[in-house]
């Protein structure tokens, strides 16, 4: 099997290349989401795509939803203190860490012991051939119960390869268009 890594990489960022009737399809990333310099010379990442994450981050830094105001506010915080305050407020984000720092972090140590991928056999069955079709996954049926980022990207990539993908979500869960 040969894979053109340029194509594989593009598929993971395909929302940047999508067009609808000739116009670029919007990526719903919030304008204040991003990486900011902190007071201690470190960097802080604020994840603000979901309304509750955005509200928590803005409450902690004490600003309106304005990129310049957030930049100025984050610059008054030490990166680790801001991470802890945002997490305590129910938000998402963190101090940017080096690979060595991540390896020493409790969460980094926890995931380091896990395999990159694990396949769990859930039952016995005879092998089945893939259905015939003009694409590699033609006629394969996929139920997409994912929510953000990697899950929907994988579901879309499966559909691009011919799978019939049905997405199921709940009305109370915030939706981010991709």
Show where each model-derived region lies.
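Acyl-CoA thioester-binding alpha/beta core of soluble enzymes
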Residues: 1-175
């Amino acid at each position: 099997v040969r894979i053109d890594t340029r194509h594989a990489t593009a598929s993971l960022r395909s929302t940047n290349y999508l067009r609808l009737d000739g116009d670029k399809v919007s990526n719903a990333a919030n304008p204040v989401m991003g990486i900011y310099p902190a007071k201690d010379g470190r960097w802080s990442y604020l994840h603000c795509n979901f309304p509750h994450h955005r509200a928590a981050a803005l409450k902690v830094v004490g600003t309106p939803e304005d990129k310049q105001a957030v930049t100025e506010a984050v610059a008054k915080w030490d990166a680790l203190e801001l991470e802890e305050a945002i997490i305590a407020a129910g938000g998402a984000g963190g101090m940017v860490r080096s690979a060595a720092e991540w390896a020493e972090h409790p969460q980094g140590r926890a995931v380091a012991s896990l395999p990159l991928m694990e396949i769990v056999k859930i039952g016995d069955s005879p092998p089945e051939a893939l259905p015939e079709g003009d694409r590699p996954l033609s006629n394969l049926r996929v139920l997409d119960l994912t929510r953000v980022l990697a899950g929907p990207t994988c579901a879309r990539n499966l559909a691009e390869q011919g799978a019939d993908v049905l997405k199921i979500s709940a009305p109370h869960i915030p939706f981010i268009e991709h």
